Amino acid sequence: MVDLAAGEEIPVEILSALADENITKWAFNSNFERVCLSEWLRRNYPEYFDSYSVDGDTVGNYLNPRGWKCSMIWSAFMGLRLSLAGIGAVPGLEEQKLKEGKDLIRYFCVPCKATKSNGGRTRNLPEHDEDKCKLFKFYNQRDVEVEQSIQKKLVKYPVPDFVWEEFWLD
């Protein structure tokens, strides 16, 4: 895990891999991750951002979707639930998504209302609640572990190539 808020930097090999369509990146709802990372790379590391485009595509200023696969698509193909928490309920899956996640995301990722009690800030930073920050990091790590557990469970049931082709078009 790289803590950008604490001043840590993403290793160059990770930055390069993000834009390399020959390296498959996995996430649950990977289009969300791909679009967010596209914007972040464009702003912070434009030298590592590689946009794709095809004729008639009005949203081609993102990382190429061919470098991404999605566990939510895999789950849908298998007829499973379409939430990470829902799939985490699959029998035998050791790692489970943390229920505190929504509150932590709201605290650290959504602007807050400036009040007298919070010193007029509009953004909660790690130093405003170190315990919540530690839990937030653990929550993010756990999501990765749940994602990896899902892939291990589903590995015997691969998604056909035509489904990935449709996913990349979408």
Regions found by a protein language model. Name each.
Residues 33, 84, 143-146:
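Catalytic-loop motifs flanking and including active-site residues across diverse enzymes
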Residues 81-99:
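A polyampholytic, Gly/Pro-enriched intrinsically disordered region
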Residues 1-82:
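Conserved RNase H-like, two-metal-ion catalytic cores of nucleic-acid enzymes
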Residues 50-68, 74-79, 102-170:
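Mixed-charge, glycine-rich, non-catalytic linkers/tails in nucleic-acid processing enzymes
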Residues 17, 21, 36, 40, ...:
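Generic, well-ordered alpha-helical scaffold segments in large soluble proteins
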